[in-house]
């Protein structure tokens, strides 16, 4: 900066990505901000996120089902359908990011770090997590019923040449409920590691295109790997029940949704949030100290930036 210039260069904003310490601070602030919303606002944001998951799971199911045509399936199996399904589904997370919607699985990381840093109380933590989970369920299942089911897009056909979309969803649902409890928990852990990393990428990468690509491939990885995501499964398995696929309520809710919920929570709150808190907890303390003085220029700049971002939410 030249002497006497009224313009200053923000050492944070000129970078396209944050440091590891800055990313953690952003994660805590992001989680802390969620506790400030009233219940109805949290619920509306969570329902919207559930709808977005339903919208893109519907599109993914249709796209994958078209490649599940019985003659094609004889040669390539489910591989082509899985590729197309995984390539379509990440759009849901980009919609959630763009609209500021609230997804339970991402909250397992962000809000947990805020809890560990004592920026939210246990009661606030439980309120945010329970409302986000309930709202996601309402949004995903409502879309499954009012759009996917009532439209007849996944209905069963007697003619095998027209039954590939139903068969694709049926086979996915059967596979999901066939896991043992422990297997499902493990697959859910793998899933939410990717989802929470996608959230972390959003908080770390400032370049728009870089952020989109990072989120896209993180979500694509879990979708094509056959991992278990609680909100996506709420849509898929409840739709399978509605169209009378070869699953029942016990298999859906006890054999899949319960262990998936446990595994997703373990991944975000224990596998990721706890180590990050242990590594960077002092960085957040330093960040808080710089709010009142100019001790560390980088953290001071981040403090100003985070406060400006918070005031805009």
UniProtKB/Swiss-Prot annotation:
Keyword annotations: Cell membrane, Membrane, Transmembrane, Transmembrane helix, Transport, Vacuole
High-level lineage: Eukaryota, Sar, Alveolata, Apicomplexa, Aconoidasida
Chief site of localization: membrane
GO molecular function: high-affinity secondary active nitrite transmembrane transporter activity
Alphabetical list of InterPro entries matching this protein: Aquaporin-like, For/NO2_transpt, For/NO2_transpt_CS
One Pfam family matching this protein: Form_Nir_trans
Catalytic reaction annotation: (S)-lactate(in) + H(+)(in) = (S)-lactate(out) + H(+)(out); formate(in) + H(+)(in) = formate(out) + H(+)(out); pyruvate(out) + H(+)(out) = pyruvate(in) + H(+)(in); acetate(out) + H(+)(out) = acetate(in) + H(+)(in)
Subunit structure: Homopentamer.
Function: Monocarboxylate-proton symporter that mediates the efflux of the waste product lactate in the intraerythrocytic parasites; active in acidic-to-neutral pH range. Transports L-lactate.
Membrane spanning residue stretches: 47-67, 78-98, 128-148, 185-205, 211-231, 257-277
Activity regulation info: Inhibited by the Malaria Box compound MMV007839 and its derivatives BH296 and BH267.meta.
Membrane topology reported for the UniProt record: Multi-pass membrane protein
Cellular component, GO annotation: plasma membrane; vacuolar membrane
Species, as recorded: Plasmodium vivax
PANTHER family the record matches: FORMATE TRANSPORTER-RELATED (PTHR30520), FORMATE_NITRATE FAMILY TRANSPORTER (EUROFUNG) (PTHR30520:SF6)
GO terms (BP aspect): nitrite transport
Compartmental location: Cell membrane; Vacuole membrane
Residues covered by region (Disordered): 290-313
Chain ranges on the Cytoplasmic side, renumbered to this chain: 1-46, 99-127, 206-210, 278-313
Entry similarity comment: Belongs to the FNT transporter (TC 1.A.16) family.
PROSITE patterns per record: FORMATE_NITRITE_TP_2
Residues exposed to the Extracellular side: 68-77, 149-184, 232-256
Name used for this protein in its record: Formate-nitrite transporter
Comp. bias regions, Polar residues: 298-313
């Amino acid at each position: 900066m030249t002497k006497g210039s009224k313009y200053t260069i923000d050492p944070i904003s000129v970078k396209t990505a944050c440091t590891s310490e800055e990313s953690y601070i952003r994660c805590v602030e992001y989680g802390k901000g969620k506790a400030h919303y009233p219940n109805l606002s949290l619920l509306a944001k969570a329902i919207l996120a559930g709808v977005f998951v339903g919208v893109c799971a519907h599109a993914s199911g249709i796209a994958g089902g078209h490649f599940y045509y019985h003659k094609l399936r004889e040669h390539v199996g489910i591989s082509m359908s899985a590729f197309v399904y995984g390539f379509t589904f990440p759009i849901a997370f980009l919609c959630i990011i763009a609209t500021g919607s609230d997804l339970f699985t991402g909250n397992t990381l962000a809000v947990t770090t805020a809890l560990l840093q004592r920026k939210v109380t246990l009661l606030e933590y439980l309120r945010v997590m329970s409302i986000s989970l309930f709202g996601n369920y309402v949004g995903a299942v409502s879309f499954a019923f009012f759009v996917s089911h009532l439209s007849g897009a996944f209905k069963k056909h007697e003619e095998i040449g027209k039954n590939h979309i139903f068969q694709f969803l049926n086979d996915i649902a059967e596979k999901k409920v066939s896991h043992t409890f422990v297997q499902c928990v493990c697959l859910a852990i793998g899933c939410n590691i990717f989802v929470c990393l996608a959230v972390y990428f959003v908080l770390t990468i400032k370049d728009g295109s870089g952020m989109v690509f990072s989120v896209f491939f993180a979500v694509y990885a879990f979708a094509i790997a056959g991992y278990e995501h609680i909100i996506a499964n709420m849509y898929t398995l409840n739709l399978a029940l509605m169209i009378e696929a070869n699953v029942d309520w016990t298999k859906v809710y006890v054999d899949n949704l319960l262990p998936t919920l446990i595994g997703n929570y373990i991944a975000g709150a224990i596998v990721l949030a706890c180590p990050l808190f242990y590594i960077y907890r002092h960085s957040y303390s330093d960040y808080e100290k710089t709010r009142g003085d100019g001790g560390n220029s980088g953290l001071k700049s981040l403090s100003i930036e985070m406060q400006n971002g918070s005031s805009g939410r």
